[in-house]
UniProtKB/Swiss-Prot annotation:
The keyword Repeat does not apply. Belongs to the ArgJ family. It comes from Aspergillus fumigatus (strain ATCC MYA-4609 / CBS 101355 / FGSC A1100 / Af293). The lineage of its organism: Eukaryota, Fungi, Dikarya, Ascomycota, Pezizomycotina. Heterodimer of an alpha and a beta chain. Keywords: Acyltransferase, Amino-acid biosynthesis, Arginine biosynthesis, Autocatalytic cleavage, Mitochondrion, Multifunctional enzyme, Transferase. This is Arginine biosynthesis bifunctional protein ArgJ, mitochondrial.
Length: 466
C-alpha cells in the first residue's frame, strides 16, 4: 500500500497504474497482454530455414528482474543483408556502427542481429560507440568469426550508457539458447519491446515465378508504440527470409517496401534516434538468386515484401500509445505519388485530426485544413473546387460523404458517430487530379496509417522515465 506520507505524485502515478492507464516503460510488472490485443499474437508460424533466435533476460533496466530484454537473431550460414536507418541527425551509436558494418561488408556475410531494449545507447559519445561495437564483436566471437558480421540495435531511453558488462556477459547465454521454434520467435519479439503492449511477430510462406514448386518463408518482428513518425521513428524491425537475394537487389527491395510501410505510419509525429529496419536473406531454401530488377522474381518479391512490411508496420499503429483507433488515410487522384504521400502524412500527424477522431467527432474541417497547409506538394495538386473527403466504414456499407468537389454535404451526424465508434476507420481524400482530370479516374495514390490521440498518450509519456 502507498502511505499518506508519500508524495502526491507517487499517489497519482499509483492510481493511474491501478486503473491500467500506465504502460511501464520497459518490462511491465507481469508482461500481461491486454485482452483486446490478444488477437494479434500468432499461435504458430512458418519460419525461414537456417535461422535461429532467442530472447534472454539481462536486466538492462534495473527494474526489470526477469523478463527478456536481449534479442539475438542468427543464421546458420552467411546472409545478404540490407537496412534502412533513421533520418534523425542524432543517430544512435548502434545505428552508426551497423551502417559501417553493412558498408564495409557490402551487404554480404552478415550472420546475426543483436538487440537490447531498456536503453537506446543514443547521444552517449565515444563510449556508446565502443559499447555498440563490443556487442557486435561478442556475437561474432560466439559465431566463431573475426570480421564484423553482426547488426546491432538498441531501444529505450536516450542519453544513458548501456550496462555493457551485463549485456556482454549474457550474449553467450543468448547464443546457447538459440532455437527455431515458434515459442523462441515469440520470446525474441517480446525481448525488443519497451512501451509496447504486445510482441509484434508475423510470418508467411510464398513462391517465386522461377520456382513455382519451391516454398520460401519470410518472418519479421518489430517494436514500437510511441515516437513514431518514420523516416524512420522509435521502431525497430528485423525481417528474415530463406530466399536467395543478392545484396544490391535486397537493398532496393527493402527501401521500396519501407517507403510504403514503416515510413507510411504515424503515432505521434516524432522521429527517433534509433530507428532501423533490417532484412537478412540466407538462401537456405535454394533456387536461383534474385539479382535483376527486370526479373519476374524481383517483381514478385517486391510485392510480397512490401505487403508483408505493411502488415508488420500496421501492428505498430495498432499498439500506438493510448490509441483507440486504427485509421487509414487514402489520398487518391493526385498528379504524383510524392504529393499524395505528403498530404496523407500531414493528415496523419495533425493533433486536431487525431483528437477529433478520439472524441468521435466528424470534424472534417480539420482534415481539410491539414490538406490545405501541406508543404512541398506540386503546384495545382490541391484545388478546393475538385477536392472531396469521405469516411469509408469497415463494415462495407456506403461511404459517408463529407465534402464533394469543394461543396459540404449534409452530414448524417448519427451515422458518423456510429462509424467513429468502430476501432478501424478509413478516410478517403480524392483530389480529382487524375490523368483525365475527373473524379475517380487515373492519378496516383498514397496510403498512410495512423492512430488517434487520447488522454492516455499524455499520461504514458508524462510518466515515461518514472
Amino acid at each position: 500500500m502507498v502511505s499518506p506520507a508519500q508524495p502526491a505524485a507517487a499517489m497519482a502515478a499509483f492510481a493511474r497504474m491501478a486503473k491500467g492507464q500506465v504502460r511501464n516503460y520497459s518490462a511491465p510488472l507481469d508482461m500481461a497482454i491486454p485482452a483486446s490485443k490478444q488477437k494479434y499474437i500468432p499461435s504458430s508460424g512458418s519460419y525461414p530455414k537456417g535461422f535461429l533466435v532467442s530472447g534472454t533476460h539481462v536486466g538492462v533496466k534495473a527494474s526489470n528482474t526477469k523478463f527478456p530484454d536481449l534479442a539475438l537473431i542468427s543464421s546458420e550460414t552467411p546472409c545478404s543483408a540490407a537496412a534502412v536507418f533513421t533520418t534523425n541527425k542524432f543517430q544512435a551509436a548502434p545505428v552508426q556502427v551497423s551502417k559501417k558494418t553493412l558498408e564495409s561488408r557490402q551487404g554480404q556475410g552478415i550472420r546475426s542481429v543483436v538487440i537490447n531494449s531498456g536503453c537506446a545507447n543514443a547521444v552517449t559519445g565515444k563510449g556508446g560507440l565502443e559499447d555498440a561495437v563490443n556487442m557486435g564483436k561478442k556475437v561474432d566471437e560466439c559465431n566463431g568469426l573475426s570480421e564484423p558480421s553482426t547488426i546491432v540495435m538498441s531501444t529505450g531511453v536516450i542519453g544513458q550508457r548501456l550496462p555493457i558488462s551485463k549485456i556482454l556477459n549474457k550474449i553467450p547465454t543468448a547464443h546457447e539458447n538459440l532455437a527455431s521454434t515458434h515459442d523462441a520467435w515469440l520470446t525474441t519479439a517480446r525481448a525488443i519491446c519497451t512501451t509496447d503492449t504486445f510482441p509484434k511477430l508475423l510470418s508467411r510462406t510464398f513462391a517465386l515465378p522461377s520456382s513455382p514448386g519451391r516454398t520460401y518463408s519470410l518472418a519479421g518482428m518489430t517494436k514500437g508504440a510511441g515516437m513514431i513518425h518514420p523516416n524512420m521513428a522509435t521502431l525497430l524491425g528485423v525481417l528474415c527470409t530463406d530466399a536467395p537475394i543478392d545484396p544490391s537487389a535486397l537493398q532496393s527491395l527493402l527501401t521500396h517496401a519501407v517507403s510504403r510501410s514503416f515510413n507510411s505510419i504515424s503515432v505521434d509525429g516524432d522521429t527517433s534516434t534509433n530507428d532501423t529496419v533490417a532484412i537478412l536473406a540466407n538462401g537456405a531454401a535454394g533456387g536461383a538468386p534474385i539479382s535483376s530488377p527486370a526479373s519476374d522474381d524481383y517483381t514478385a518479391m517486391q510485392e510480397i515484401l512490401t505487403s508483408f512490411a505493411q502488415s508488420l508496420s500496421q501492428l505498430v499503429v495498432r499498439d500506438g500509445e493510448g490509441a483507440t483507433k486504427f485509421v487509414t488515410v487514402r489520398v487518391q487522384n493526385s498528379p504524383d505519388y510524392e504529393s499524395a504521400r505528403l498530404i496523407a502524412s500531414t493528415i496523419a500527424r495533425s493533433p486536431l485530426v487525431k483528437t477529433a477522431l478520439y472524441g468521435r467527432d466528424a470534424n472534417w474541417g480539420r482534415i481539410l485544413c491539414a490538406i490545405g497547409y501541406t508543404q512541398g506538394v506540386a503546384p495545382g495538386t490541391v484545388v478546393p473546387e475538385r477536392t472531396s473527403v469521405s469516411f469509408k466504414p469497415v463494415d462495407g456499407s456506403p461511404v459517408l460523404k463529407l465534402l464533394v468537389n469543394g461543396e459540404p454535404e449534409q452530414v448524417d451526424e448519427e451515422r458518423a458517430s456510429v462509424i467513429l465508434q468502430e476501432e478501424d476507420l478509413e478516410i478517403v481524400v480524392d483530389l480529382g487530379g487524375g490523368e483525365k482530370g475527373e473524379q475517380g479516374l487515373g492519378g496516383e495514390e498514397a496510403v498512410y496509417w495512423f492512430c488517434d490521440f487520447s488522454h492516455e498518450y499524455v499520461t504514458i509519456n508524462g510518466d515515461y522515465r518514472t
